[in-house]
Design a protein with these regions (language model features):
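Bimodal "functional hotspot" detector
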Residues: 1-155
Length: 155
């Protein structure tokens, strides 16, 4: 009888819902090709507002939703701190980041790129400095990549 009874719920409800979540892009490694592959993920905005860099790296440590992808970050790695200074994120990781890494230059580069590409998706970030247990100048076991440099996104 009354067409108004069929009206869909007010628009605000979806907007509230959308405001609570945000789409982030995380970079994982394709298990077969070993290439870096982006994966979109909806996450709680609250986490992005309180600890954006730590939140994103912790998501990178977890396994991706897509079964063809895998985390580029070594198992057991913990984020000890993440702080923006200027436009560079100082990312402090636990020793497992070095100790548990599978090694090999390609795998090491993929690990660095996964972190850098994920964090530089945020407008305020142009580079990442990696610390291990608060210390600079650490390196992977292969010694191909030293962490003394600030890593920037390679297009």
């Amino acid at each position: 009888k009354n067409a108004e009874n069929n009206v869909i719920q007010p628009q605000e409800e979806t907007t509230d819902e959308q405001m609570r979540t945000a789409l982030v892009t995380l970079y994982y490694v394709n298990k077969e090709t070993k290439e870096l592959t982006p994966e979109g993920r909806m996450i709680d905005v609250k986490n992005l507002l309180t600890d954006p860099y730590e939140t994103l790296v912790n998501l990178l440590i977890e396994q991706p939703k897509n079964e063809k992808l895998q985390s580029a970050i070594p198992t057991g790695t913990k984020v000890l701190g993440a702080e923006l200074k200027g436009d560079v994120v100082y990312l402090d990781l636990s020793n497992e980041f070095i100790e548990n890494h599978e090694g090999g230059e390609k795998a090491e580069q993929a690990t660095i790129k996964a972190i850098v590409n994920t964090l530089t998706e945020l407008n305020e970030v142009s580079g990442v400095k990696i610390l291990i247990n608060g210390q600079e100048n650490k390196e992977f076991k292969d010694r191909k990549i030293n962490f003394k440099d600030t890593f920037t996104r390679i297009k």
